[in-house]
């Protein structure tokens, strides 16, 4: 999963022509690690229609603050440079897929 930073967030996420799912997490966060396979599967199933990236909240303070990320994991789908869906806490692959489906079907 590609990592983004405060410095690259605008180019990698906000300027993307396809939706981008951002996992706000941290290396010490076990639930963050637990959801990564589900997010990777969603990205693989929707290849070319979505990207999944992660942002380390310990190393990048500005972006989580901008989007009111108060706990990890927080997963936000951005489309057209705007946050469209937010899920806080760990969820099942099916919950992520259901929530993000309207943005991945074209």
Which functions belong to the PLM regions below?
Residues 57-63:
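Structural microenvironment flanking redox-active thiols in thiol-disulfide oxidoreductases
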Residues 17-18, 24-28, 71:
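Short pre-active-site segment immediately N-terminal to redox-active cysteine/selenocysteine motifs
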Residues 31-46:
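Typically the conserved alpha-helix immediately C-terminal to a functionally engaged Cys/Sec
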Residues 71, 76-106:
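Non-catalytic, surface beta->alpha helical segment in thiol-disulfide oxidoreductase systems
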Residues 2-20, 61:
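A short beta-strand-turn-helix
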Residues 29-32, 75:
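The canonical Cys-X-X-Cys-His
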Residues 5, 25, 51-53:
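Conserved Rossmann-like nucleotide-binding pocket used by diverse enzymes
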Residues 21-22, 52, 75:
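Hydrophobic beta-strand anchors of alpha/beta hydrolase catalytic cores
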């Amino acid at each position: 999963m590609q990592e983004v930073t405060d410095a690259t967030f605008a180019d990698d996420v906000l300027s993307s022509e396809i939706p981008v799912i951002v996992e706000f997490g941290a290396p010490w966060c076990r639930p963050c690690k637990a959801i990564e396979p589900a997010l990777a599967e969603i990205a693989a199933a929707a290849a070319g229609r979505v990207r999944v990236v992660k942002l380390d909240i310990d190393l990048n303070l500005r972006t989580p603050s901008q989007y009111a990320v108060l706990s990890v994991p927080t997963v936000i789908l951005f489309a057209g440079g705007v946050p469209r869906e937010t899920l806080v806490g760990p969820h099942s692959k099916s919950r992520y897929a259901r929530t993000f489906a309207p943005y991945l079907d074209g």
